[in-house]
A protein has these predicted regions:
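Alpha/beta enzyme core
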Residues: 1-7, 17-156, 164-191
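Metallocofactor- and cofactor-centric catalytic cores in central/energy metabolism, strongly enriched
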Residues: 10
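Small/polar loops that bind or transfer phosphate-bearing groups
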Residues: 14, 159
Length: 191
């Protein structure tokens, strides 16, 4: 939280258990508290994700990043996945933006496009590449695919594996407008 304040980062991404403490540390700053819902595997039920969203917001979360249920998606339960996104969006909106985490490295191109379309249909604010928990990384190819799939109806957050200014700039140029990285200070300093 202190580094985010010092460097003016947009948000600090944390688990719901730490939202209240982070909100206290960031009170009076422009740095937002971003709660990871369904983290890390997205396998919680819709009911739990909605409850987690409401609880995080009540404790001071100003943004919500929800992990989709990748297993349900892989099983072809598209209606379930889209409904889950809609329910989390409904719990958060209109005051708290929602980012839908795809776990891009686990999905086919067709599945990535499908989830992006679900996020748009559910009126999510962003689609996001990865949690950083399961491996993988944000790639230029994924950002370009996601940008085409959302067609300007959602913003894009690149997250995971962004270690250098060069990688950051490549993803920015591809269409990402927000970034999740543990290397923010190095990137800001141009390293």
């Amino acid at each position: 939280c202190e580094e985010a304040k010092e460097y003016g980062f947009a948000a600090v991404a944390i688990t719901p258990a730490n939202v209240k403490y982070a909100a206290q540390l960031l009170e009076g700053t422009n740095v937002k508290v971003e709660a990871a819902i369904g983290f890390p595997l997205g396998s919680s039920t819709t009911f739990i994700k909605v409850a987690e969203t409401k609880d995080a917001i009540a404790n001071g979360a100003q943004e919500v990043d929800m992990v989709i249920n990748v297993g349900a998606l892989k099983d072809g339960l598209y209606e379930y996945v889209e409904n889950e996104i809609k329910e989390v969006v409904k719990a958060a909106h209109p005051s708290v933006p929602v980012k839908v985490i795809l776990e891009t490295f686990l999905l086919t191109e067709e599945e990535k496009v499908k989830v992006c379309q679900m996020a748009v249909n559910a009126q999510a604010d962003y689609v996001k590449t990865c949690t950083g928990f399961n491996g993988g990384k944000a790639t230029k190819e994924d950002i370009l695919l996601m940008k085409k799939a959302v067609d300007g109806k959602c913003k894009i957050k690149a997250s995971t594996g962004i270690k250098s200014r060069e990688e950051f700039e490549e993803l920015l140029e591809a269409g990402a407008v927000r970034f999740g990285t543990s290397s923010g200070i190095l990137i800001v300093n141009g390293d």
